[in-house]
A protein has these predicted regions:
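A cross-kingdom feature that marks ATP-driven nucleic-acid transaction machinery
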Residues: 1-137
Length: 137
């Protein structure tokens, strides 16, 4: 589905006069800015790979997936973006529900997080947990 993305989420932070302290005390806004930052980076990577970035929303069930990465070979990946650890289980559930409802399974599924420096793979689900710091050329 169509979803508008910030070109640079720092513009929103500047317009709202958000400081580090304000963001730490408003995790909801911090989460939106974090998601926008990750989506910006994913869009740049997908453009480099001649792919596309989409958002998924099922209008019947309400299920949403933050990012669908469509590769130029027709494969795709499903990505959830979560700032905090407390949202990872919910993200796993969303990804598994999505996978189980698709005719063609995603090439991979991952959750991009803001709280660790270690890339991990959940042994039960195969879902990767990837820190934002891993998003680099």
């Amino acid at each position: 589905s169509v979803k508008r993305h910030f070109t640079d989420p720092s513009l929103a932070c500047a317009c709202l006069a958000l400081t580090k302290e304000k963001l730490i005390n408003d995790l909801n806004t911090f989460g939106f800015m974090f998601e926008a930052l990750v989506e910006r980076d994913l869009k740049i990577y997908m453009e480099y790979l001649n792919g596309n970035l989409f958002h998924f929303r099922d209008n019947v069930t309400g299920l949403e997936i933050d990012s669908i990465l469509e590769f130029n070979d027709g494969e795709y990946a499903a990505v959830e973006i979560k700032l905090g650890f407390n949202k990872v289980e919910e993200a796993k559930k969303n990804l598994l529900t999505f996978k189980n409802n698709m005719i063609k399974e995603p090439k991979f599924m991952c959750i991009i997080v803001g709280y660790t420096d270690v890339i991990a793979k959940d042994p039960e689900t195969g879902i990767y947990i990837v820190p934002i710091t891993a998003l680099k050329p």
